[in-house]
Amino acid sequence: MAGMSRFAILLGGDLVVTPRLRRQIAGARIIAADSGMKHASALGLVPELWVGDFDSAGSELLLDYALVPRQTHSADKDATDGEIAVTEALRLGATEIVLIGGLGGESDHATAHLGLALHLARSGQKCFISNGDEEAYPLIAGTYE
């Protein structure tokens, strides 16, 4: 669809690669948030941008994806690496955001990702979260058909 720009943000949570997930991100532009880069290989993707403080990416990922442009941020920041990735996607014209690897794993991270999806939906941004075998769609009162 003309004018649509779907971005998939690779987050560091759990991921199960499924045919449905592959269809959902087909043709999407990809941004990795810190250790979310670990999912790039399993998905057969090379992100156009890698953001974060790189406190959890690990030296092997840093070497394997050395050619991917990076935006390094201080660990002492007021946003999560996922939020920074979403901000970049919006800056680059995202009309839809898929948060990949945003469920499962550490409960505080999953909760933060759910809150981020709600924030995006409240601002009119189309988004959802998937880890391949679980999905979450923010529903805002008065906006669901």
Where are the regions a protein language model picked out?
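N-terminal beta-strand-loop-alpha-helix module at the start
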Residues: 1-64
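Short phosphate-binding loop-to-helix
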Residues: 70-91
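Short glycine/serine/threonine-rich phosphate/pyrophosphate-binding segments
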Residues: 17-19, 79-83, 106-111
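Non-catalytic positions within long, well-ordered alpha-helices that form the structural scaffold/packing
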Residues: 41, 90-93
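Generic beta-sheet signal
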Residues: 33, 53, 73, 99, ...
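Anionic-ligand-binding alpha/beta catalytic cores of soluble enzymes and soluble regulatory domains
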Residues: 96-141
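A glycine-rich helix N-cap at a beta->alpha junction
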Residues: 66-75, 124-128
